[in-house]
């Protein structure tokens, strides 16, 4: 899944906060979105664990298949990644806000 050495090559990148003055005037997202290239690099950080923590009983409470999703993003198959995500998370715009991994 992803790039075998991706976690060594790409640092974890958080989505930056939008300026507070800008946020006062709308109800848009608190963070700025990552671009396509940045999403690609972050998806490449998935380490292809033997037993992925994100798939354990302590991992994703929705049982999302995160390694598969990251691999699709890494390969540039964004539409397929979305379809895979929607199989287990019908409302990712809500559940993604409370994800314990973020």
Predicted ranges, named:
Residues 1-102:
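Ferredoxin-type iron-sulfur electron-transfer modules and their immediate structural context
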């Amino acid at each position: 899944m992803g790039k075998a050495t991706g976690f060594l090559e790409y640092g974890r990148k958080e989505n930056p906060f939008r300026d507070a003055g800008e946020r006062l005037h709308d109800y848009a997202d608190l963070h700025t979105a990552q671009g396509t290239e940045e999403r690609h690099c972050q998806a490449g950080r998935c380490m292809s664990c033997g037993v992925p923590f994100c798939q354990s009983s302590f991992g994703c409470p929705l049982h999302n298949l995160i390694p598969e999703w990251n691999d699709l993003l890494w390969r540039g198959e964004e539409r397929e990644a979305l379809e895979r995500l929607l199989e287990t998370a019908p409302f990712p715009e809500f559940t993604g806000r409370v994800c314990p991994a973020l």
